[in-house]
Amino acid sequence: FIQQITGVLEYERCYLNTQHQKDLVINQAKKTFNDDTITKLNDILVPQHLGVDEKDIVDEINETPEKIIVFNHRPDTYKHFKEFVAVCDELYEMRQDFKVWVPLLPNPTRKYMVTTKGNKEWYYKELQKCYVGFSPKQSYGGWSVSTTDGMMNGVPYIMYDDTYYHELNEMGDFFEDDYTALQLLNTYLDDPEYRNEEASKALDWMRNKLVYKDKMLEMLFYMDRLVIETRAVKDTDRFKEIVEWIKTAGKLSKKDIIERLGWGRGIKWTPYRRALMNHPNIFDVNGSTPYYYYKY
C-alpha cells in the first residue's frame, strides 16, 4: 500500500469510482503519512462515476410492473445477501403478494424466489417489469452497476445508507437497518403511486447526472487543460541528447530513456514527452510498451 501511494503522489490526478473508495484510501494513508502529504493525496484522488450509455436509458417507466423485488447483485457475503434474504423471509410472513428475482443465484432457495436468466437485452427487459430493487450494504463500497442497470430501466431502488449509494441517487430512499428496509419494501408494495414517483425520480437522475458521455467529457476537459498548462521543455542539451539517442537506436521506450538518464520518481516526464511530440522527426506508437521512433 505504501509503495502504491508513493507512486500515486507523483500523479496529477488519480481516479476512483466512488467517494467511499477515496475515503478508505485516505483513512489508511493517515496511518503512515503526515498531514501535508494527506492534503496532497486528497487533491490527487478524484471520484469519477462510471455512468451509463445514454441510449440504454428507457424513455419512460413501466407504471404497471409486476410485484417483483429484484436483487441483481452477486448473492455473496460481501453483498450481505443472507441479510437480504432474512428481510424477505420476514416480509413473506407478513404478505405473499410478491416475488424476489435473483438472476445471479444458481437456483431458488425460497418459494418466493425466481432465478431466471438470459442475455443482456432480455435482462434489461425483465428489469423493466420489476417493482423495486434492493441495494445492500457492501464491504468495499464500489460503484454498483447493478443499481444503475435497474434505475436506467425505470426501477426505483431502496439502498443502504452510505456514500457509495448516495452518489448513485441522492434523491432515493435509504435504510440503515433491516427494520427500515422492511418498512420501505412494504411502503412500495402498498403504494403504486409512490413507487411510480420514485421510479420517475430515479430515471430523471440517471438522465441528468449519470450519463457516461458527460462523465467522459468532464475528464477530457481536464486532460486538455492539463496538457495546455504543461509546458514542453526547451531545446536543452539534455533534450538534444534524448533526440540523438532515439535517432541512433531508431526507437526507444520511455523506460529506456529514463534508465539512460538515471532519473528517479521525482522528475516529471510529461514536459519531455510534449517536446518529443513537437519534434518534426519523432512520433510515438502506443502498445503494451509505448515507443518513440525517429523518422528521416
Model-derived segments and their meaning:
Residues 60-79, 85-89:
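Conserved donor-binding/catalytic core segment of Leloir-type glycosyltransferases
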Residues 124, 145-152, 165-166:
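Short alpha-helical segment that forms part of, or immediately flanks, the ligand-binding pocket
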Residues 5-44, 52-54:
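A short, active-site helix/loop in glycosyltransferases that binds the activated sugar's phosphate group
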Residues 125-142, 155:
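Acidic donor-binding loop of glycosyltransferase active sites
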Residues 43-66:
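Acidic anion/phosphate-binding donor-loop and adjacent secondary structure
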Residues 152, 156-159:
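Short hydrophobic beta-strand element within catalytic cores of glycosyltransferases
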Residues 192-224, 228-231:
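A charged, aromatic-enriched C-terminal amphipathic alpha-helix characteristic of glycosyltransferases
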